């Protein structure tokens, strides 16, 4: 089954986030990986046809990615 352009964008963004999480220092990278997984799982139930909301989440996620991927950001705490 062929993926839509938006699905490809989400998958590409997910992989970029995982790569950035793995690049964080030990032992923090495990928490970063858990954070990435949690954020994407949290939105897993969104309808594939809700394009505007998915695009909104990609924009918000991109801003978070830029903030969190800065070298001075070492650790993350979430619940």
Swiss-Prot record:
<protein>
    <recommendedName>
        <fullName>Succinate dehydrogenase assembly factor 1, mitochondrial</fullName>
    </recommendedName>
</protein>
<keyword id="KW-0496">Mitochondrion</keyword>
<comment type="similarity">
    <text>Belongs to the complex I LYR family. SDHAF1 subfamily.</text>
</comment>
<dbReference type="Pfam" id="PF05347">
    <property type="entry name" value="Complex1_LYR"/>
</dbReference>
<dbReference type="GO" id="GO:0005759">
    <property type="term" value="C:mitochondrial matrix"/>
</dbReference>
<comment type="subunit">
    <text>Interacts with sdh2 within an sdh1-sdh2 subcomplex.</text>
</comment>
<dbReference type="GO" id="GO:0005739">
    <property type="term" value="C:mitochondrion"/>
</dbReference>
<dbReference type="InterPro" id="IPR008011">
    <property type="entry name" value="Complex1_LYR_dom"/>
</dbReference>
<dbReference type="GO" id="GO:0034553">
    <property type="term" value="P:mitochondrial respiratory chain complex II assembly"/>
</dbReference>
<dbReference type="InterPro" id="IPR045295">
    <property type="entry name" value="Complex1_LYR_SDHAF1_LYRM8"/>
</dbReference>
<keyword id="KW-0143">Chaperone</keyword>
<comment type="function">
    <text>Plays an essential role in the assembly of succinate dehydrogenase (SDH), an enzyme complex (also referred to as respiratory complex II) that is a component of both the tricarboxylic acid (TCA) cycle and the mitochondrial electron transport chain, and which couples the oxidation of succinate to fumarate with the reduction of ubiquinone (coenzyme Q) to ubiquinol. Promotes maturation of the iron-sulfur protein subunit sdh2 of the SDH catalytic dimer, protecting it from the deleterious effects of oxidants. May act together with SDHAF3.</text>
</comment>
């Amino acid at each position: 089954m062929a993926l839509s352009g938006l699905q490809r964008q989400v998958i590409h963004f997910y992989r970029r986030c995982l790569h950035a999480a793995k690049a964080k220092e030990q032992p923090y990278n495990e928490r970063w990986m858990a954070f990435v997984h949690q954020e994407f799982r949290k939105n897993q139930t969104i309808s594939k046809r809700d394009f505007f909301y998915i695009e909104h989440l990609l924009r918000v996620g991109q801003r978070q990615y830029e903030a969190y991927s800065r070298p001075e950001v070492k650790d993350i705490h979430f619940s």
